[in-house]
Amino acid sequence: MQRGKVKWFNNEKGYGFIEVEGGSDVFVHFTAIQGEGFKSLEEGQEVSFEIVQGNRGPQAANVVKL
């Protein structure tokens, strides 16, 4: 599992990016966020996640808010 902070997340469009220290930013889609209810992330929020290969490159999967 990787750890990072949410760089930005657009609730209307349902996606954003996670900053990884010493690495490239990782795309995150709301469907990758674990938990019940409205799936959203806040800027600066710490998360853990896995990196998988998506259609357009690396993206976050199994995102858990810390």
From Swiss-Prot:
Residues 4-63 form the CSD domain. Induction: In response to low temperature. SMART domains: CSP (SM00357). The keyword Transmembrane does not apply. It is found in: Cytoplasm. InterPro entries: Cold_shock_CspA, Cold_shock_domain, CSD, CSD_CS, CSP_DNA-bd, NA-bd_OB-fold. PANTHER family: COLD SHOCK DOMAIN CONTAINING PROTEINS. Homodimer. This is Cold shock protein CspB. It comes from Geobacillus stearothermophilus.
